[in-house]
Amino acid sequence: MSRYRGPRVRIIRRLGALPGLTSKTPQLKSNSINQSASNKKISQYRIRLEEKQKLRFHYGITERQLLKYVRIARKAKGSTGQVLLQLLEMRLDNILFRLGMAPTIPGARQLVNHRHILVNDRIVNIPSYRCKPQDFITIKERQKSQGIIVKNMDLSQKYKIPNHLTFNSLEKKGLVNQILDRESIGLKINELLVVEYYSRQA
């Protein structure tokens, strides 16, 4: 399944606020779920599916990519759900978004693809690049690159930078301090339901 490129408002009407996808927050339609015994299995599946879709659309990844992350998380020590969130949060495109250097994760991905971003003084053009503690992120020394980031930062001022990251606004430099904890996730999600959804596939 390819990455979603359709109307973003339609997605957040169905799934709720997804700040990585869009800053818009339209009113949600009331959606009553039939709680009868005959529909119980269907509704439980739907709940798990929607939690999985939240992760996909928020982080802007394909179904295949998400399944790959789930498989990696299953092999790691600790809670599978928490490790999954950490893997997604440490992607370079998401780090740029959380630092306020891009208004959305698709916007951050574009910065990386267009070679505006350096990690540890080296250009990285892979949005899925996995950042690690003590990595520092800077902007290419070009007027165009600098101008794009400054404009993005003005748009992103309403978001608070999480504790596992630091941003020096004068030097336009971000630092990954540590692996984030569960409380720093910028998305309302029940990751255990996502793990359950993939229990037969991963």
UniProtKB/Swiss-Prot annotation:
One of its GO terms (cellular component) is small ribosomal subunit. Residues 90-165 form the S4 RNA-binding domain. Keywords: Chloroplast, Plastid, Ribonucleoprotein, Ribosomal protein, RNA-binding, rRNA-binding. It comes from the Eukaryota. GO terms for molecular function: rRNA binding; structural constituent of ribosome. Disulfide bonds: none annotated. InterPro entries: Ribosomal_uS4 (IPR022801), Ribosomal_uS4_bac-type (IPR005709), Ribosomal_uS4_CS (IPR018079), Ribosomal_uS4_N (IPR001912), S4_RNA-bd (IPR002942), S4_RNA-bd_sf (IPR036986). Its main location: plastid. It is found in: Plastid, Chloroplast. CDD domains: S4 (cd00165). SMART domains: Ribosomal_S4, S4. GO terms for biological process: ribosomal small subunit biogenesis; translation. Part of the 30S ribosomal subunit. Contacts protein S5. The interaction surface between S4 and S5 is involved in control of translational fidelity. One of the primary rRNA binding proteins, it binds directly to 16S rRNA where it nucleates assembly of the body of the 30S subunit. With S5 and S12 plays an important role in translational accuracy. Belongs to the universal ribosomal protein uS4 family. This is Small ribosomal subunit protein uS4c. It comes from Diphyscium foliosum (Nut-moss). The gene is rps4.
